[in-house]
């Protein structure tokens, strides 16, 4: 990891400013984030939908929701590569999937750690630092001293945003549909007496409307969590001071070079003057 390659302004921030920086990172890196994110998320979702028997379509939403830790690993990989100015294509993201699945603690994240509210802050320890066991626990405890509560609230806020957006879209549909036919389709997943064709489309709309909202919100969540992690690293390891000293050293080298050149020119000029 080369601090000189970082593409964002590293300085000490409070936790909420760090989260705001993460949101700005999504806007700045969107060309690198969304092509791969869109391809992987929606191709997996559509494959799962069409392979699932009609009687079990209701569970597609649950499976997609449960696999959030997998998607977070993809997003963190993209953000970490972009942060350090590493060239990245969609093919690079796809080729990294086997390692992201097997080398980042995904099994734990999908089982007994699934409901951790600080999973976004903890993920870089697993994925980027590759720490395990006692070293991971000590590192996590240290990072949590000043960022844990903000990481938890970020998780809660993003989860609420997803459902607020979902219910807002449903409410909008109800308001603009004078026939109530769309409403009948939308509520069919929760009606055991609904006709099968109606229920099929109701489940499809519900699942992929939520997926669209998740497609928007989750990069914000992961970038905010990653920025929290970076801010704690900056606090603990004084990245901002190190970068400031490096910048100062670069400027001094430039000044020294120009000063030396000026002295040489002056010396040559004086020598020529006296020889004449």
Feature-to-residue mapping (PLM):
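Hydrophobic alpha-helical membrane segments
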Residues: 1-276
């Amino acid at each position: 990891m080369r601090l000189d390659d970082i593409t964002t302004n590293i300085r000490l921030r409070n936790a909420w400013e760090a989260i705001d920086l993460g949101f700005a990172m999504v806007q700045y890196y969107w060309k690198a984030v969304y092509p791969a994110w869109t391809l992987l998320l929606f191709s997996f979702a559509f494959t799962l939908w069409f392979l699932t028997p009609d009687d079990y379509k209701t569970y597609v939403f649950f499976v997609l929701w449960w696999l959030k830790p997998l998607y977070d690993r993809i997003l963190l990989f993209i953000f970490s590569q972009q942060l350090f100015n590493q060239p990245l294509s969609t093919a690079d993201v796809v080729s990294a999937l086997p390692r992201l699945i097997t080398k980042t603690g995904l099994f734990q994240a999908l089982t007994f750690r699934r409901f951790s509210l600080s999973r976004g802050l903890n993920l870089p320890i697993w994925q980027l630092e590759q720490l395990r066991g006692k070293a991971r626990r000590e590192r996590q405890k240290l990072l949590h001293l000043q960022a844990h509560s903000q990481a938890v609230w970020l998780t809660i806020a993003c989860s609420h945003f997803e459902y607020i957006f979902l219910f807002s879209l449903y409410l909008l549909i109800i308001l603009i549909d004078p026939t109530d036919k769309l409403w009948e389709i939308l509520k069919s997943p929760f009606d055991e007496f609904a006709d099968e064709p109606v229920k099929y489309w109701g489940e499809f709309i519900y699942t992929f409307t939520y997926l669209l909202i998740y497609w928007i919100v989750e990069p914000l969540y992961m970038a905010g969590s990653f920025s929290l992690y970076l801010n704690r690293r900056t606090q603990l390891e004084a990245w901002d001071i190190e970068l400031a000293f490096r910048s100062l050293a670069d400027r001094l080298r430039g000044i020294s070079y120009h000063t030396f050149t000026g002295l040489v020119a002056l010396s040559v000029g004086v020598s020529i003057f006296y020889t004449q």
